[in-house]
Amino acid sequence: CRELEARVELTQNAFTKLWDPQHEHFYNRDEFTGELIRVPTSACFLPLFAGLAGNEQVLKMVSTLENWMDQKFLLVPSTAPHEPSYEPERYWRGPVWPHINWMICEGLSDYGFDDLSRKIRMQTLELISKLGFYEYYHPLGESGLGGSSFSWTAAVCLIWDNSTNTR
């Protein structure tokens, strides 16, 4: 039990080192330099899923998601639309990934942001319904990308279909 508690504490401490109070984002960290990689990505929202974000951090993440939504992008692009490295069809540089959206939606609901979670879920399901079970999608809903019969996309649909009555 103590070993497990120590691992949990290590994980919590690691997450606190990923928060950048100046930019109000969780960021990835370069393993070699130790520097934060200050590019907002969909990974910035995964602390919601882990349950490791504080209340102020959650509010900042929700604000960021709403800002991205106001820019007419379907959520959640894998790289922030305003970033120079954003490319809507390039692997992990802009497309929407259903399994990442599922984790973000779960986290949003866990923190009480059911309306935003529902919006993201519905946008994602509409993309899948319109375009098919692709690996990932153009963030403006223009096309499905990558593999065209992707099991994790189907799994996300099944999970959301089975949880409709519980959320």
Predicted regions and their residues:
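Inter-helical turn/loop segments and adjacent helix faces that build the functional surface
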Residues: 1-3, 111
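Short acidic alpha-helix initiation/capping motifs at coil-to-helix transition points
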Residues: 6, 96-99
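Extended glycan-interaction surfaces of carbohydrate-active proteins
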Residues: 12-96, 123, 129-167
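Alpha-helical support elements that line or immediately flank enzyme active sites
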Residues: 43-54, 101-114
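Hydrophobic transmembrane alpha-helices and their immediate junctions
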Residues: 118-124
